[in-house]
Amino acid sequence: MAKRIVEPFRIKMVENIRIPSREEREVALKEAGYNPFLLPSSAVYIDLLTDSGTTRYDHHGSMITGDEAYAGSRNYYDLKDKVKEMFDYDYVIPAHQGRGAENMLFPVLLKVKQEQGGAKKPVFISNFHFDTTAAHVELNHCKAINIVTEKAYDSDTYDDWKGNFDIQKLKDNIAPEWCRKRCCHYFSITCNSAGGQPVSMANLKEVYEIAKHHNIFVVMDSARFCENAYFIKERDPKYKNATIKEIILDMYKYADALTMSAKKDPLLNIGGLVCIKNDEKIFTLARQRCVPMEGFVTYGGLAGRDMAAMVQGLEEGAGEEYLHYRIGQVKYLGDRLREGGISIQYPTGGHAVFVDCKKLVPHIPGDQFPAQAVINALYLESGVRAVEIGSFLLGRDPETGKQKHADMEFMRLTIARRVYTNDHMDYIADALIGLKDKFATLKGLDFEYEPPVLRHFTARLKPIK
């Protein structure tokens, strides 16, 4: 039976929300081109679009200490000290968010690989690149290759580490001419596109050792690093008695750099980081890109108060009691749905419940976006906005223009941090379970407008008659 986890906080301020009428929702969805990204937030009752930047703060005290100096803000040096404490990395560049961090680092990795005499057909290899990460790889004329464990594709079967790299695939074609193509191994922790699934410490270590043997740089996408550390504590007996911060330090031994959207686990509404362990050349080249792309090197597109909040958020996000509640709330929603006969990626991950829409609407083919059809039905039924992680998000192959094949067609129910109560989780579960009899009647979708890059953000769709 689904178990509620009590919230480890008191509510000090509230925001009133309302459920738009069915008629209002129908009009809003049509005007949005059947793409919930284009809905105004006023047309949404419970917003499960993303956990990025949607956290509720308790950082306001630290924000008052913001030093808004253009150069040399003391908040930058506080942030640098916190990064050293948590990750043991020497070099820090702030960014306005995660994609800003990627935009500074990825071209540098390509440049360095080219200087080494390789990268004629450069690739980034990941357990699973998320959408903006893959876009930055492809905008740099590189290929994004995903090799998550095959266990991730079996949504009904429990496995502790569905975010792991497939080690055998990583070792395939490891000959020198293939290694010269690899700009980096890129860990996504937790692995968002596979269902917010964790990566084991053993997998981190093995991937890193393979990379170092072949002179390949390793980067950690660190949006949800605290959640990954919590899963390691819960599931790896070696770390049962370790603190979350001790586990984090061990995790980051197995990378050379990190990019971070601080809008997730560090509990911010804005912010990102590039951190380099000890490679001064990579740091210098990335910092050169900071000034024209993000801002001066000690603020990187952020106000001093945002860096002050990041220092606090990095600490709070690693709190074990908070993580127990956070991941427990997601599990509660997942358990409610499974008890109601809704297929999900099992076990639930750290930040969202991923509903397996291939099983809910098997009559809708991938190129008609089955998860998007379920998302729109849920919105019309309840005012709940979710997001698609499947064919619609994956987009087209930049070389052939053909739709990329999606092994998973997920509706992601993403839980904002410290925003919704367990009663909201029950409302979501009841609404989706109540749709079960309507799934067979849902129709697929086609494009009215398709942008060339990251199409799912601004595309307009129409129901197929």
UniProtKB/Swiss-Prot annotation:
It catalyses: L-tryptophan + H2O = indole + pyruvate + NH4(+). The keyword Lyase applies. Its EC number is 4.1.99.1. One of its GO terms (molecular function) is tryptophanase activity. The modification N6-(pyridoxal phosphate)lysine is found at residue 264. Keywords: Lyase, Pyridoxal phosphate, Tryptophan catabolism. It comes from the Bacteria. Its cofactor is pyridoxal 5'-phosphate. SUPFAM superfamilies: PLP-dependent transferases. Pathway: Amino-acid degradation; L-tryptophan degradation via pyruvate pathway; indole and pyruvate from L-tryptophan: step 1/1. The keyword Lyase applies. Belongs to the beta-eliminating lyase family. Homotetramer. PANTHER family: BETA-ELIMINATING LYASE-LIKE PROTEIN-RELATED (PTHR32325), TRYPTOPHANASE (PTHR32325:SF4). This is Tryptophanase. It comes from Proteus inconstans.
